[in-house]
Amino acid sequence: MNILRFEKAVYTLPILFGSALHIDRVAKIQKYSQSKYNFKLPIHSFYGAPTNSIWNGGRPPYYNDSMVSNKTKQYYKNIDAHKYLTYTNYLAGDYLDDPVSNLALKMLSKDDGVIITDERLHKYIRKTYPKLKTKASVVKITKEQPNERSAEYYNQLLDRYDYILLHPDDNTDLDLITQIKDLSRVEVLIDERCTRNCRVRDLHYDINAQSNIPIRDRDSNIMEQEGTLWSKYCPREKAVVLKNGKEKLDILVNTLDEIQDLYNMGIRRFKTSGRGS
């Protein structure tokens, strides 16, 4: 009897360089599943970035375990999944010599990888760390094509990257997805908590990027920008009224039926959001 709805699907989870407690709990569940049921959980990779990495473009983690140190190599070895560093800062190309970011890469193994926004960083990693896989990030796609993406655009990314993320706005655009040439290398973020067609998504990414670069290089009013974004512009709290009269937040979390449609089309890689949690 098949106990999995999506039998051939694999998942990537947001706990790399997050809480050691979460990593430990997932590891115990993996071991228990293997020993008790002879079943390897379909976790393809963990993703995240060290808190002191300039190349990090997402929410900076603040766990004691999120620093790169002489214990990091063993930390990597203890993880029963591939590791993907979230180096999605679009300003990363200005700091290619960042020692923390480079050290975290050097300790990765073959077929681990990097999630990238900046093409300068992509070229640098291809040249300096050729054993690593590269993945085009949602941030990259948003910065380059904030309003609408074409199949041609996605196919061009597939020519350069090992894997690509689909923009969450496109997760239900089945006509577009059918035109992407290799769905086995497309990953879908299934629980995006931003709203569809958000007009300030790229601004949010700008603020995240600024927050991770040295203080001397940041916009002087970065804190004010962030406050204004959340208080005036972010539409995440907007609700839609359903047919039954109840309200539902207009966010991009996919339903099981929507995931089933993607799976039936040939997509096998699914990603959950978060960062260290």
Language model: regions and residue ranges:
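Active-site pocket-lining/capping segments in soluble small-molecule metabolic enzymes
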Residues: 2-150, 160-277
